Amino acid sequence: MEKMHITNQEHDAFVKSHPNGDLLQLTKWAETKKLTGWYARRIAVGRDGEVQGVAQLLFKKVPKLPYTLCYISRGFVVDYSNKEALNALLDSAKEIAKAEKAYAIKIDPDVEVDKGTDALQNLKALGFKHKGFKEGLSKDYIQPRMTMITPIDKNDDELLNSFERRNRSKVRLALKRGTTVERSDREGLKTFAELMKITGERDGFLTRDISYFENIYDALHEDGDAELFLVKLDPKENIAKVNQELNELHAEIAKWQQKMETSEKQAKKAQNMINDAQNKIAKNEDLKRDLEALEKEHPEGIYLSGALLMFAGSKSYYLYGASSNEFRDFLPNHHMQYTMMKYAREHGATTYDFGGTDNDPDKDSEHYGLWAFKKVWGTYLSEKIGEFDYILNQPLYQLIEQVKPRLTKAKIKISRKLKRK
């Protein structure tokens, strides 16, 4: 096994084709981290000219100290049963990490627990310290240890039927409601950033500046690994739909009124149907007024939600999502999610990753809402083997490990204060 010098394109091709590859190991992802003070180095190992393992090493300076952390996010990208390749990757990583004065090498492989026996054993044998099997969104991890993934390698009907029944009904309703899902461009990031600001204010979290999203889009869109989707509501088109539905409801009432006059047996049923139709008419009249007001203010329509969809080979990722507070009954997020899944499938993806979660948290948990949303999309829990640290400077490592929990508690307090506002 030997060190190899490969191009960025060769690195990315290996990551995208490997079962343990991940978005965070793409070279263009490293470009997005520069804004937050990270810089990258890359390594590759192989035999007879054939690459057998790669890793993208991210480095960040420790504040006020001449040291760095070496972080291999969702790496190494290698077959973890291949001890020789794994050992060669560690040797290469150590060489660079020491040159960059790293106090530790942190990895969190994209390897699931039920397939991770070799990885656990071989990493520990090499001297890695396992950080344990904590909850998926534990503050002790950089990346979530658990994510929710929908298999999307199926036709439209099979995909829809994989969703939980109630969610399936919501998706069907969203498709009828009259929103339009657009694959947008860089200009659309302005709208997305505005929607993200609204979402942050509603849900009580700090949001990123538009430059952050532009950075991701600029780095990854050219290779087809980042797409922006926006959901639009056209008032004129939907007023026409509401008028049509009102006409149908009035016709239905007339039909049941006629049946009441001709059949006493059907009188009770007819009255119930008439009452139901009248309730629907009242709701549609309210909706029509709202849409007419919207048409006066925004005749071109408004955007209700948006999301960034990412790719790494056969894996797709719902990275960021945002939504308006208006017209939520149109279920724009349901329309968008289903559309993005189909788009991802049509562009070679077999899985759709909703991102981090805990495993079936209690209803009073701050993470319950995430779990409840993600579990209805035909997802399974992807439980990773977690984080591992290879310690290069034991005294500094111990000091930082002692300080980190205090910093985490401070961040949690700030987050909770924001949510209470």
Curated annotation (Swiss-Prot):
It catalyses: beta-D-GlcNAc-(1->4)-Mur2Ac(oyl-L-Ala-D-isoglutaminyl-L-Lys-D-Ala-D-Ala)-di-trans,octa-cis-undecaprenyl diphosphate + glycyl-tRNA(Gly) = beta-D-GlcNAc-(1->4)-Mur2Ac(oyl-L-Ala-D-isoglutaminyl-L-Lys-(N(6)-Gly)-D-Ala-D-Ala)-di-trans,octa-cis-undecaprenyl diphosphate + tRNA(Gly) + H(+). It holds the Pfam family FemAB. Its EC number is 2.3.2.16. It comes from the Bacteria. It is found in: Cytoplasm. Signal peptide: none annotated. One of its GO terms (cellular component) is cytoplasm. Monomer. Belongs to the FemABX family. This is Lipid II:glycine glycyltransferase. The gene is femX.
